[in-house]
């Protein structure tokens, strides 16, 4: 069984390498558009798109079938574009004019002070550390390890082009994050996916197991949590906006405060997802049936 899994992982990695080579043969605008259109055509036909449809029904029940299908097609195009752009990440690092930063003063205010930036898998989320490094050079990012050993090693090396400081999700990663924050570093976290050992928070009116790390680190150690949103603008151009730090009225009960804080983060995510639902990753198994 292990051998078959290893073979499958190796074949998957070969496809990724071939796609990477192809994307690097041409400029980022061309490959982003091509892979985006290919994903738009093929993606909706995959079985996993049923989950995206179900998630849309749960989160935004007012949408009719036609609108849901339109969002799913657009979502796949964005995912294709994001993948192609990741293979050409050096271009996004070099061509700074492609990323317009709003709320730069918030970055300046928190520079070298230890801050947690939170967002979700929206538009091209990989550009977040690139934008932060425009002002604050000590930036780290949290990542979820892939089951595919080969792909995981490749992703870590590829992300080193963006930041040397990478932290795995989980208890060991949290310790590393805390030490990094103590040294004045900034950490970017995507907190929109299900985390089984998180807290049961509200997300689009449903119970969703959510990472409590940002809330916990902020409430226990005083590190600010700054939300941000990324928007795709005209192909391979982006706008990233930073907002005021999240604050709550403390109750004196740490568990209650962590939940309230996490709910506030989720409310922010709801707003930016609702603004451009076609740019969010609807394929994730976000809502556990056991809790809804």
Predicted segments — roles?
Residues 97-101, 122, 148, 167-171, ...:
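A conditional alpha-helix N-cap/helix-loop micro-motif detector
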Residues 113-171, 196-199, 232:
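Catalytic core of membrane glycerolipid acyltransferases/transacylases, capturing the structured
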Residues 18, 30, 52-55, 154-155, ...:
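Hydrophobic alpha-helical segments typical of transmembrane helices
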Residues 62, 70-73, 109-112, 134, ...:
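Non-catalytic C-terminal accessory region of glycerolipid acyltransferases
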Residues 2-119, 163:
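Membrane-anchoring hydrophobic helices of lipid-metabolizing enzymes
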Residues 48-51, 148-149, 208-211:
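Active-site metal-coordination segments of metallo-dependent hydrolases
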Residues 93-100, 144, 163-169, 203-205, ...:
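Short, flexible loop segments at the rims of nucleotide/cofactor-binding pockets, characterized by
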